[in-house]
A protein has these predicted regions:
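Short low-complexity, flexible loop/linker segments enriched in glycine and/or proline
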Residues: 44-47, 108-111, 185-188
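Short gly/ser/thr-rich secondary-structure transition/capping motifs
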Residues: 28-35, 51-52, 126-134, 183-189
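Residue-level detector of anion-binding/catalytic polar loops
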Residues: 28, 91, 113, 169, ...
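An N-terminal-biased, well-structured beta-alpha scaffold segment characteristic
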Residues: 1-93
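Rossmann-like dinucleotide/phosphate-binding beta-alpha-beta segment
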Residues: 135-197
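Structured loop/turn residues at beta-strand edges in well-structured enzyme cores
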Residues: 44, 62-65, 116, 191, ...
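Phosphate-binding beta-alpha-beta segment of Rossmann-like dinucleotide-binding domains, i.e.
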Residues: 88, 96-146, 158-161
Length: 197
């Protein structure tokens, strides 16, 4: 019988992911809330690591002699020591499409919160001060307003769709994306970030 692969899950992941691990008899796994001494000892002979935002520095990665893959549960990898990962021959994966919509929706939430002065008006209503609306700062519409999206990867492309739904004028700065791609999604490319701001 082949030896089970050992997986360390650093910082909890969604229960469906845990259920997938539980349902596969070829894996054994352990969940750690943080990087601690116990984890440092167990990492030496683990085959895979799933990690969220905790820092995975050189001294930990370089001690993982059997490590084949680091699965970053998110889109960035600034918390992983890339040099050490490469040196031991491990593969680094990310969940590239996991949060683009969530982040774009959060940006829209913040834009609406700011433009509609949600917190001020909400507080006024909760206190029963309905006539205070004339004393509060005026709200503004997103319609017809200019917005600059700096970076036009998955999040930027998800955001432009939502901004256009509010009929905003969308300007995009990204030196790595061609004009046609931006134009095809309804944006106007700007080439100088300082000038655009």
């Amino acid at each position: 019988m082949p030896e089970k692969k050992k997986i360390l899950v650093i910082q909890n992941i969604h229960q469906e992911g845990i259920n997938l691990l539980k349902g596969n008899s070829s894996y054994e796994f352990e969940i750690f809330d943080e990087i601690n001494e116990d984890l440092k000892q167990k990492i030496v002979d683990c085959d895979a690591i799933s990690i969220r935002t905790a820092k995975l520095p050189n001294e930990i990665i370089s001690s993982a002699k059997k490590l084949q893959v680091i699965s970053r549960h998110g889109v960035g990898y600034d918390n992983i020591d890339l040099k050490s990962t490469k040196e031991i021959g491990a593969t680094l994966t990310i969940t590239a499409t996991a949060n683009a919509v969530a982040v774009a929706e959060h940006v829209m939430f913040m834009l609406l919160n700011i433009s509609k002065r949600k917190d001020m008006y909400d507080q006024s209503v909760k206190l029963g001060k309905f006539n205070d609306r004339n004393k509060l700062p005026k709200t503004i519409e997103l319609w017809g307003k200019n917005i600059l999206i700096a970076g036009f990867g998955r999040i930027g492309q998800a955001l432009i769709k939502r901004c256009l739904g509010f009929e905003m004028n969308v300007f995009v700065y990204d030196p790595y994306i061609n004009d046609e791609k931006i134009k095809s999604l309804g944006g106007k490319k700007v080439n100088d970030l300082k000038e655009a701001v």
